[in-house]
Amino acid sequence: HTCPACGGETKIEDENGIRTLVCTNEFCSAKKIKSFSHFVSRDAMNVDGLSEATLQKMIDVGLLNEIYDLFTLKDHKEEILELEGFGEKSYQNLINAINDSKQPALANFIYSLGIPNVGLSNAKLICKHFKEDFNAIREADAEDFIAIDQIGPMIAEAMVSYFHTPHNQKILEQLLQYVQFEKKEESKTEQILEGKTFVVTGSLDHFDNRKQLKEEIEQMGGKVTESVSKKTDYL
């Protein structure tokens, strides 16, 4: 099989019995657009107003090649204004949204990198364990990650592999010129839910939405996942 987007070679990856056909070309155009749209998504860097279609246009005209190029778009006003659907106001809104994204929480930043199997809740567990120290996370080995409750060998290997790949190291060095992590307040809340895993479902009476309940659980030390598994304590 070859990749329908770039014609590159593909391979089958087997993770927990789920077989997935994956393109092996790291410069694949389809993978590139997915990595950009993941990077700007709400739970990642949260750059408002950048649809996949807009990102594709910017990639096609050479404005975006690596994810850190987002932070240099302000230097390309004329080219952006030439893109279909962009005027002075939408350009300014975009630049404002990019500027607003420059102080993410560390967990959202790690999630934004698209490290395989590292969802936002796992990123939060990792950041909490390493006391929000990004350098400690970058330098950690697999044993350090496996020592974290609910982080298994697959995630540990993915983290170590990501931070030891020269191409990714270059991306991080560039990103860190623009990004400053939000200072996390030390949680004063008693960690009564530490080590417990929750899945939030159904309708809520005492909370405005699921996100609010999720944050409350995490503040008390619990972990919220998207789906029920044998590790789930409460539904």
State what each model feature region is.
Residues 6, 17-19, 54, 194, ...:
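A generic structural signal for well-ordered coil/turn residues at beta-strand boundaries
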Residues 12-25, 79-94:
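Membrane-interacting alpha-helical segments
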Residues 56-59, 95:
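Short, well-ordered alpha-helical packing segments
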Residues 48-56, 64-82, 147:
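Compact, charge-rich alpha-helical regulatory domains located at protein termini
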Residues 32, 39, 84-235:
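DNA strand-break repair and replication-stress modules
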Residues 1-48:
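Cys/His-rich short segments
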